[in-house]
Structures are given as C-alpha cells and as structure tokens.
C-alpha cells in the first residue's frame, strides 16, 4: 500500500480536517474502550490524542511516518505507542477491547483481500467480547460527485461501480497555483463489510448513520458500524 500522506499532505492534514467533529466520536468510542483502544490509520492523532486524554489506553498503527511525526509534535503525542506499517498486517503488543478505523480509511486498501486482512488484523488484536468500529461512506450512486468546494480547494470523487474503484481528486490552491492530487480507494458496501467481518470471526453488533446514533437508512451516505468478537 502506497503512502499518500507524506510531506505537505501530512503538514496540511489537521487544517483540512479542522471542521470535523471530535467530541461525538469520543462519546461513541469511549464506552467500548475500557480495555484499551487500537486505532488503525492513527495519523496525526485527531481522535487518538483526545481519547487518551479521557484516560483510555491508546495505541496505533499507521503507514505514514510523516503523519505520525505530526502526532509526535502535539502534547502527549510521544506517549502513544505507534507501529509504522500497513494496518492490515502490522501487529502491536497487547490486546484491546476496541479497535477502530475512521474517516473512510478502510477504503485506502484498494483490494478486497487487503480489506479482509484489515478485519482479520483488527480481530487478532481484540480480546473476547471486544469490538471493531468502522466509519466509512456508502458507495456512490453517481460516477462524479463534488465533495468539497471552496476558494482554495475543490474535491471531486470519480467512481466506477463495476470495479468499486474510487478516485478522489483534490485540487488545492498553493502559492497562486492549482495543484492536483489523485488518490485511489476501493469503495465497499455495508453488506460486503459484514461478510468480511464474518470471515474474520466477528459479528455485526450495531450500525448507525453517524456518531450520535442516527438511524441508518437506505438514504444514508455513510455509516458507523460495530462488529463484536464473540466472548
């Protein structure tokens, strides 16, 4: 898996996600995290750091050394153990009552095998009765869709339903010039995720439209799903 978050992408990441909610995410995750939490694709610690500040033992895995370097610059960032590597295969010490992967990061695995391996790796780290939480979008209905539009950034998703290949095109204004970054993903349906979970020995516990437990419906564009490892 390629590191798409090196250099300036890592440096700008916190700014680009500054408007995303944090407290509702923490409120959702914390009740599952009594036995510690493992974040796959921990990145700059947007969620891991405030979760640790609530008293949760947190560890992480991330492919990008530059993203983790941003985490290390923050207060408390050097206290969270992070393994550098592919979150589908990299192991960390210990077991946890919660593993989680957020903000469409499961789609960074661009093959079905990679996504199944992600579930299997999460399950290996879970103690019996532990839960794996995934936040991800529902596959698009349109071939092209604009997901962000501002004076300095335009984001366009290009989706091929036949291959489930999604490419996010980011056009960013930098020093008066527009720069493009195109990142590949594999979009995956809730039903396919449920099957991946079964392969990994997990079972669906709950599914919601968002962090405040809004009902998931046929009109939902994303979901927060929880799978449980049998006790």
Per-region residue spans from a language model:
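Conserved class I S-adenosyl-L-methionine
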Residues: 1-43
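Class I SAM-dependent methyltransferase SAM/SAH-binding core
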Residues: 44-89
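A short glycine-rich, Lys/Arg-flanked "PGG" loop and its adjoining helix->strand segment in the class I
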Residues: 116-128
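C-terminal lobe and adjacent flexible extensions of AdoMet/dcAdoMet transferase-like proteins
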Residues: 192-231
